[in-house]
């Protein structure tokens, strides 16, 4: 009989010489400041940032949502370490002017902190 076990997820660590953002709940690294696209976004619980790429983040199933800027297919994202929902990933934008968001990530400010090198 073969016993199946859940595989351990290994946490990614971002370079310590760069400014980065971490999960406020568990301090897992989430994104480098260099991957920040915009600070002018609104999440479901307040202000949010748009990032080009993230680490230590899992993605739920995509669903269509009517957001402030129109209809989008989005998937909730969560911290792979503590499983807190952080924001969402834009899978598809239905309006031409919003296509730049596809494949990008929203993280709400209430779920992240500035970490390392923010003097």
UniProtKB/Swiss-Prot annotation:
InterPro entries: Yippee, Yippee/Mis18/Cereblon, Yippee_fam
Protein name per the record: Protein yippee-like 3
Main location: nucleus
Binding site for Zn(2+): 23, 26, 79, 82
Subcellular location: Nucleus, Nucleolus
PROSITE patterns referenced in this protein's UniProt entry, alphabetically: YIPPEE
GO CC, any one term: nucleolus
Keyword Transmembrane helix found: no
Domain (Yippee) ranges: 19-116
Annotated Pfam families: Yippee-Mis18
Transmembrane regions listed in the UniProt entry: none
Keyword set includes Nucleus: yes
Protein task: May be involved in proliferation and apoptosis in myeloid precursor cells.
Source superkingdom: Eukaryota
Keywords noted in UniProt: Apoptosis, Metal-binding, Nucleus, Zinc
GO molecular function ontology, one term from the record: metal ion binding
UniProt organism field: Oryzias latipes
A biological process term (GO) from this entry: apoptotic process
Protein family according to the UniProt entry: Belongs to the yippee family.
């Amino acid at each position: 009989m073969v016993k199946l076990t859940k595989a351990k997820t290994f946490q990614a660590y971002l370079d310590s010489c760069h400014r980065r953002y971490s999960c406020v709940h568990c301090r897992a690294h989430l994104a480098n400041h260099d991957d920040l696209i915009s600070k002018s976004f609104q999440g479901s619980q307040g202000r949010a940032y748009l990032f080009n790429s993230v680490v230590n983040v899992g993605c739920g199933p995509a669903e269509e949502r009517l957001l402030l800027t129109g209809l989008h297919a989005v998937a909730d994202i969560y911290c792979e370490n503590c499983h807190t929902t952080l924001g969402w990933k834009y899978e598809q934008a239905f309006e031409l002017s919003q296509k730049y968001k596809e494949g990008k990530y929203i993280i709400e400010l209430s779920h992240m902190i500035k970490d390392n090198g923010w003097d």
